[in-house]
Amino acid sequence: MTSSIPTSGEALPHYVSTAPFDPSLIEPNTSGMAAFSKASQLRLMWWQFRQHKVAVWSGAFLVLLYLSILISEFLAPYNLHTRNIEHIYAPPQGIHLFNDGKFVGPFVYGREMTLDMDNLRRVYRDVPTDIQPLRFFCKGDTYHFWGMFEGKTHLVCPAEGGEMFLLGTDRLGRDVLSRIIYGARISLTIGLLGVAMSFVLGIVIGGLAGYRGGTFDLIVQRIIEVLQSIPSIPLWLALAAIMPVTWSPILVYLGITIILGMLDWTGLARAVRSKLLALREEDYVLAAQLMGAGTPRIIGRHLIPGFMSHLIASATLTIPGMILGETALSFLGLGLRPPITSWGILLTEARSVSVIALYPWLLIPTIPVVLVILAFNFFGDGLRDAADPFR
């Protein structure tokens, strides 16, 4: 059997198609694959983040919490400094819906106070015949909404002529629930401001160290090592103790924010430096240099956006440390001071063992602190996993 030998220039009979390559012949071209191939980095992060259910619920909780601090005056049943002299160290009241088997609606029982002559303690007892229905969207204590205009409307109020202390009162007869709501405004915002300051310092210092290298990088690394070798709490205490006692509450607030922000930038700076050490040798950086771009433009426009998602996730995980730092300083009496109210200041009421034993509801402000810390940790873990390209 003989076979014809192709002449010079004749196409070989290989199984090769001259038609354009169509990827759909190999991979199914579904709508999901098409959307995935066209999705931006932020959309891909969102799709990955949605799979972390705990992080999604934590994020929703934090969003609602930060929205609530905008209307603290409306949510709180009483003003921040409203005193009820007849209800000092009153225990929490329970909300009831039924009385003698009949539906009445949300109400609290009235109370009467007697003095225990054995230990001189105030003893409060519910009066079952004194039913005090709760009022909603009602007129209560007068407040100045964000210091701009006067208002009287509250979400919930006690009955006319009655009292309502769902989380009890403190030694001055002030409602603990109202003070927790007002204190959230300080405790939550001081963490954001501190992180914003450390975010800027970490990006600027770490970016310059990683991009330029050399002596500047060496000096920055030694400074970071010295700062990280000092325990955080003693350093916070030392810096907080040097603030003059004559400062106004606003200046103290700003001072605590600066202290927390200036001492927490080291970890972020190292992360930025390590990223820029790897990215500064890329071709697009060389192209930007040849086109005459300066150092700030190259770092801010070309390098930082490449891993901004990682920076946001890292910053989110540092907010709980800021909140704990403010709470610890205020609890020890070296942070914020009255009349400013934060969760740390509320916990100063419970520094005595005898107070905790007799009035345990004064420890209730620890609950929102723990919930916020856990929510930020879960939310930050979700962001970090969503921003990780190797997952």
Where in the sequence are the language-model features?
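Gly/Trp-centered helix-boundary motif
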Residues: M1-F199, I203, L208, I299, ...
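Alpha-helical transmembrane segments of integral membrane proteins
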Residues: T169-R391
